[in-house]
């Protein structure tokens, strides 16, 4: 699971204006990073104008999925991940990032922006890209689900070992019953042998 890109955009026809973004291109060679980064920006700028206000959509392109959300106030966001990344976590992060951006930059600051500027930047996006690489740690519900899965595995192992121990106990009980029978037979034979000796 990999999170590659987070972008905050203002829709504009035919392409959106990217207001702030962050990406993790460490899995690409140094020579590929520029091209891949431009491709992610292009995907984000192309998807947001084609998203209806108040709607979410996920667009697959090769091995990537672009999760887009355009708020009804006109602020949009795109997260680009691999295909394994959980959709729910992507949209949860998108909501969180857009809310924080609006708190930091009211609509009046960005609604007429024609290009990205340092005063519209959001450096916290870099931290989100790093923190959300592992969606299990970043998302409380997924973390609880993972803990439940791990507990279930431990319980299964414990139950299996108890059952295995139970089977061994059953085997021991059977052996002890067989031992009891053989010891009873031995005792009777010994008694007969001893009684035979006493009569003589």
Curated annotation (Swiss-Prot):
Residues of the propeptide: 198-200
Topology in the lipid bilayer is annotated as: Lipid-anchor
For the keyword Membrane, the answer is: yes
Q: Which Pfam families match?
A: Longin, Synaptobrevin
Q: Which GO terms describe its molecular function?
A: palmitoyltransferase activity; SNAP receptor activity
Task: Report the Gene3D superfamilies cross-referenced here.
Answer: 1.20.5.110, Longin domain
**Longin domain boundaries:** 7-129
An example of a Gene Ontology BP annotation on this entry?
autophagosome-lysosome fusion
Keyword Repressor listed: no
Q: What is its main location?
A: membrane
Recorded hits in InterPro entries, A to Z, give:
Longin-like_dom_sf, Longin_dom, R-SNARE_YKT6, Synaptobrevin-like, V_SNARE_CC
Q: Which residues form a coiled coil?
A: none
Keyword list, A-Z: Cell membrane, Coiled coil, Lipoprotein, Membrane, Methylation, Palmitate, Prenylation
One GO cellular component assignment for this chain's record is:
SNARE complex
Give the UniProt family note.
Answer: Belongs to the synaptobrevin family.
What name has this protein been given in UniProt? Synaptobrevin homolog YKT6
What species was this sequence derived from? Yarrowia lipolytica (strain CLIB 122 / E 150) (Yeast)
């Amino acid at each position: 699971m990999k999170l590659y890109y987070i972008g905050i955009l203002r829709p504009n026809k035919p392409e959106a204006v990217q207001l702030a973004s962050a990406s993790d291109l460490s899995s690409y060679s140094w020579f590929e990073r520029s091209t891949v980064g431009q491709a992610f920006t292009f995907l984000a700028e192309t998807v947001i104008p084609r998203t209806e206000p108040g709607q979410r959509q996920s667009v697959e392109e090769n091995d990537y999925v672009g999760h887009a959300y355009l708020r009804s106030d006109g602020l949009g966001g795109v997260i680009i991940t691999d295909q394994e990344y959980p959709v729910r976590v992507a949209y949860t992060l998108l909501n969180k990032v857009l809310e924080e951006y609006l708190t930091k930059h009211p609509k009046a600051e960005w609604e007429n922006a024609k290009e990205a500027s340092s005063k519209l930047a959001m450096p916290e996006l870099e931290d989100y890209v790093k923190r959300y690489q592992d969606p299990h740690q970043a998302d409380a519900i997924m973390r609880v689900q993972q803990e439940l899965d791990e507990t279930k595995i431990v319980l299964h192992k414990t139950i299996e070992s108890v059952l295995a121990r139970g089977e061994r106990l059953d085997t021991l009980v059977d052996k002890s019953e067989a031992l009891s029978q053989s010891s009873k037979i031995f005792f009777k034979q010994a008694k007969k042998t001893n009684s035979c000796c006493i009569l003589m």
